[in-house]
Amino acid sequence: METFKSILHEAQRIVVLTGAGMSTESGIPDFRSAGGIWTEDASRMEAMSLDYFLSYPRLFWPKFKELFQMKMSGSFEPNEGHLLLAELEKQGKQVDIFTQNIDGLHKKAGSRHVYELHGSIQTAACPACGARYDLPHLLEREVPECTAAGNNGDICGTVLKTDVVLFGDAVMHFDTLYEKLDQADLLLVIGTSLEVAPARFVPEDASLIPGMKKVIINLEPTYCDSLFDMVIHQKIGEFARSLGMKK
């Protein structure tokens, strides 16, 4: 514990990589764990693919909403782990969070520099005209459409595309992640098994940066624990509470 506090105290530029384990204590399931959305029915991956959306946009949305309806309710709240990262920023540290989660809880906790690698469930855009929409509009109808008016006054009416990165979409912000990593003095990995590319390569690449400290906080061991200076096998909310963090 004291070693971790010392590492945090010395760090001024922190890159954080978070996964599903970051939000499980907020009530959001880990999709890839036992009983998760993908492990229960692998065919769901096909329905959540870019190809499926492009081919059947009106069939896509009911399936998408069924799978993610709990997340779209907006009822989930940040846990102590999210709040800990926001607090580090308040202390004057540069904290850049790169999350594989789509729940928006880092922003809800108050963190300002959040890069959503897999997009956000809170927003969508029109593939035709680029108009953007937030959650209330997406929930108004089973299949959300663009309501923007064109130059001729006609309503666009195109089926919106979620900002969630679908299977077949490109993961976002990885160039920015490596730019920030080159400037950082601490890599903090939280709640991810590091099994999914390209995130799985980050710890190894960080090991090549002179002076970089690396800490992982994850309930289960990962294949690359040996690359880290400190390994903590604990839930992040529980660990944050042990540091005195309260909701």
UniProtKB/Swiss-Prot annotation:
Localization in the cell: Cytoplasm
Active site residues of this protein: H118
Catalytic activity of the protein: N(6)-acetyl-L-lysyl-[protein] + NAD(+) + H2O = 2''-O-acetyl-ADP-D-ribose + nicotinamide + L-lysyl-[protein]
Statement: the UniProt record of this protein carries the keyword Membrane: no
GO MF term set: histone deacetylase activity, NAD-dependent; NAD+ binding; zinc ion binding
Enzyme's top EC category: transferase
Segments forming domain Deacetylase sirtuin-type: 1-247
Residues that, per the record, bind Zn(2+): C126, C129, C146, C156
Cofactor binding description: Binds 1 zinc ion per subunit.
Cofactors required: Zn(2+)
Key words, A-Z: Cytoplasm, Metal-binding, NAD, Transferase, Zinc
SUPFAM superfamilies tied to this protein: DHS-like NAD/FAD-binding domain
CDD domains, per database record: SIR2-fam
One GO term describing the cellular component: cytoplasm
UniProt key word Zinc: yes
Family: Belongs to the sirtuin family. Class U subfamily.
Chain's role: NAD-dependent protein deacetylase which modulates the activities of several enzymes which are inactive in their acetylated form.
Annotated protein name in UniProt: NAD-dependent protein deacetylase
